[in-house]
Amino acid sequence: MRVLVAMSGGVDSSVAAALLVQQGHEVVGATLKLWGGPSDSGCCSVADVEDARRVAQQLGIDHHVFNLTEDFEDHVVRPYVDAHAQGRTPNPCIECNRAIKFDRLLDRADRLGFDLLATGHHARVTHEGAHRLRRGADPDKDQSYVLSMLGQDELARVVLPVGEMTKDEVRAWAAQIGLRTAGKPDSQDVCFIGRVEGRQGFLQRKIDFHPARVVDRDGEAVGSVDAVELVTVGQRRGMGHGADGQRHYVLSVDVPARLVTVGNAADAVTSRVRLPNTTMTWVDRPLGPGDRAVAQVSAHGRPAACSVAWNGDSRVVEFDEPQRPVAPGQTVALYDVTEPDAVVGAGIAA
């Protein structure tokens, strides 16, 4: 089969390409130019493009660079900035996967006559009736959460070659065949934000910051912040302590009112989170009222048993046990209660 491999310049996508070549597929590598600004934090750098090109050369496959900077700006960077301006906590990696890698790149693969699109994500896709997205074999590197917004159309045409491998196995295999990326560190940060500049410096170039009052649950003033747009629900850093000596946690952020409400650890829990239906994506079938599921609210978050209720135009995830607050804008991935490694769907917290 003809397979287009998204090669980021990292070890996972390098091994994905190598495995497909070994299996006898007609493989072509593609690296995405996504960001025209400065970045030193991985997956968008000139060095990454060169690593991908050199690996493709080593494997004897063609390699192309696709310029998707405008799409990336429109669908990832600008929504990220806008979300912070509204006091929300976005996940740009999920949006990049949904709108760029598994939309724009998949469309390009189709138009160029490829049968499949491959990436180096640590997750699995099975095709038993419906196409199912499942957790990767390595629980410490599982990336099913960041792919949880994919549906049947995308999963039908996607292959994830390293999903059955642990990260150690990936690196060992890369070293065995002499890939230059075998020892390359994983990228850790938002790819379009440089480590030196950081989130604050990046956002400060894009939006105005506003000071805000910090109050406790009774409305009593307990402090202030210089930039309400940088505060996240659940945050404790920089929030100080109460009169009882307990650390403060952010309970809510109101950007228009320039107000941050804090409480102690006992206050910083939630029993439910609302997911507007307009933000929901279902892998196969939607969950109905009372259906059971397992929720995950961050890439490395602890899975939490829950029930799903309907409330007008939203699904409401009701946790069996209290959880840390879910910040507005965070993605909540839902997994099958009978097959906990299988993604059912995902939505964005209101």
Regions found by a protein language model. Name each.
Residues 1-148, 159, 167-170, 175, ...:
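ATP-dependent adenylation/nucleotidyltransferase module used to activate substrates
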Residues 11, 36, 118-125, 132-350:
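AMP-forming adenylation/ATP pyrophosphatase catalytic core
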